[in-house]
A protein has these predicted regions:
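Non-catalytic tandem-repeat scaffold regions and their flanking low-complexity/translocation tails
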Residues: 22-473
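N-terminal Sec-pathway targeting helices
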Residues: 1-20
């Protein structure tokens, strides 16, 4: 018994010693870089990410704070001419190095460095892309970061680099690189590059952005999809599509990380560089609106498909709902299908105290439980800002929301139990906060609906995950 107690004490003492040593390094690391003093007393280099503080140069790395640039020469440190804008604020040079954020640019002459534009720089011989955005350092694991934080706290290593400004050298070229008009891409007359990466086979003379349709029916040029009459690209990725004049791109509400491309001639759909299974085309998006959804849902010959952001692939949500092809979208995310009314709505599932964090995000297609034969009649818009709409079905009034979940409105359709609320909604001086209060105090009430279809992206497992019987793949 005494030996066992002695062993337990030794183990506990060891754990405490390791914990003390670990904390003794991590806590000093948190206060080692004087962020507040740099912000308050540092001297910024123009509108760049660089600041001179205490005769040393620091670079601001979004999501990671300030980084000391040990090799930077403060006396000769400079921004390049015509480089004091957003796309060039992360690039600088001194008499020894060129800098992309806090990292040096290899094989680059800082004395002859000039700006080309759109994040591209050249020394007359070598050309490099230095991104104006940061990217997470996937080579640094959580355990490695903690270990490096500990070493940094004790002064044994540099601050761990969790985020960084990506840089990409371009191939040597006899012909100087130039920015292509209207696209922001760069070319030497033979090859074309997106963010420093080759777009294989692209024709620089014909390459142009794909048209992107907006919610207000206007059209803008894509910043990620391009075509040249033969090839189609997402960023630098060559897509397995033939170029057609009818190609167009679109986004769904607040799902800004998901850029969609659609070919009406073939019915083929693409999300970023992920192609929907061609064998199930033609596809048709159920709704182009996304204020209340977490996934874009596409009808096909084999059912409804969506992009799973966690698994990074196209998945099957279920069978096509009956008569969905004949439904009419009378307002964003709200449909009439004969005497039925259907609507799309998103939901999130979060863990509790024992397992906190986001578990899943879903998008459901519901059938409104009120299926009376009365027609829908639009009563009016909610202010000139078009926050939403008031509709009537028989003797019942409803509020159709356009603000979305990001504005704390939980669903696209609400029941209006009192006529006084209808008059308040149609008031010209109604504010967004008034709508939130109405939804909170019951003047706008959640409707009752029957779930017809559900698409779920699961970010972590819960104790009820085994109850998920939705189709997959």
């Amino acid at each position: 018994m005494k030996a066992r107690k002695r062993l337990v004490l030794v183990i506990l003492s060891g754990i405490m010693l390791v914990s003390v040593l670990f904390i003794s390094g991590v806590i000093p690391a948190m206060d080692k870089t004087p962020y507040y003093d740099i912000d308050r007393n540092g001297k910024p280099f123009g509108h760049s990410v660089f600041t001179l503080y205490d005769d040393r140069v620091y670079a601001a790395v979004p999501s990671d704070g300030y980084f000391l640039i040990p090799g930077a020469d403060p006396d000769s440190f400079r921004l390049l001419p015509d480089n004091n804008n957003h796309n060039g604020r992360q690039f600088a040079a001194d008499k020894y190095h060129a800098w992309c954020g806090n990292l040096p640019v290899a094989d680059f002459n800082p004395q002859t460095a000039v700006t080309i534009g759109n994040g591209y720089f050249t020394d007359g011989k070598n050309t490099v892309f230095c991104a104006p955005y940061t990217r997470i350092n996937n080579e640094l694991s959580a355990l490695q970061k903690l270990y490096q934080e500990w070493r940094y706290g004790w002064g044994l290593s540099d601050k761990p680099l969790t985020y960084y400004y990506p840089q990409q050298p371009l191939p040597s070229s006899v012909t100087p690189y130039r920015i292509l008009p209207d696209s922001g891409l760069i070319s030497n007359g033979e090859q074309v590059f997106f963010d420093g990466k080759l777009m294989p086979g692209a024709n620089p003379a014909a390459l142009r952005p794909v048209a992107v349709r907006q919610d207000d029916k206007s059209v803008r040029e894509s910043r990620v999809f391009y075509h040249d009459g033969e090839h189609v690209y997402y960023q630098h990725h060559l897509l397995p599509l033939k170029d057609t004049e009818s190609l167009y791109g679109f986004y769904l509400g607040n799902l800004f990380q998901e850029a969609y491309l659609f070919d009406p001639q073939t019915g083929q759909a693409v999300m970023n560089n992920v192609v929907f299974p061609p064998e199930y085309a033609p596809y048709r998006v159920i709704s182009y609106y996304g204020q209340h959804v977490n996934q874009g849902l596409f009808l096909s010959r084999r059912g409804v498909y969506f992009y799973d952001r966690k698994k990074e692939k196209i998945r099957r949500a279920g069978d096509n709902p009956p008569l969905q092809d004949s439904c009419q979208e009378i307002s964003p995310l709200i449909f009439t299908c004969g005497i039925e009314t259907r609507y799309l709505q998103g939901a999130e599932s979060w863990g509790g105290r024992k397992s906190p964090g986001l578990i899943s995000r879903s998008t459901m297609l519901y059938r409104l439980d009120d299926n009376t034969a009365d027609n829908w009649v639009k009563v009016g818009d909610i202010t000139s800002h078009h926050y939403g709409e008031v509709w009537q079905k028989g003797g019942q009034y409803y509020y159709f929301d356009r603000l979305g979940a990001s504005q704390l409105m939980r669903g696209p359709i609400y029941l209006i139990p009192e006529n006084t609320t209808v008059r308040a909604l149609l008031s010209d001086d109604l504010r967004v906060d008034d709508l939130r209060k109405m939804a909170h105090d019951g003047r706008l009430q959640a409707v009752s609906g029957t779930e017809m279809l559900k698409a779920t992206t699961r970010y972590k497992e819960s104790m009820f995950s085994f109850l998920n019987f939705s189709d997959d793949d």
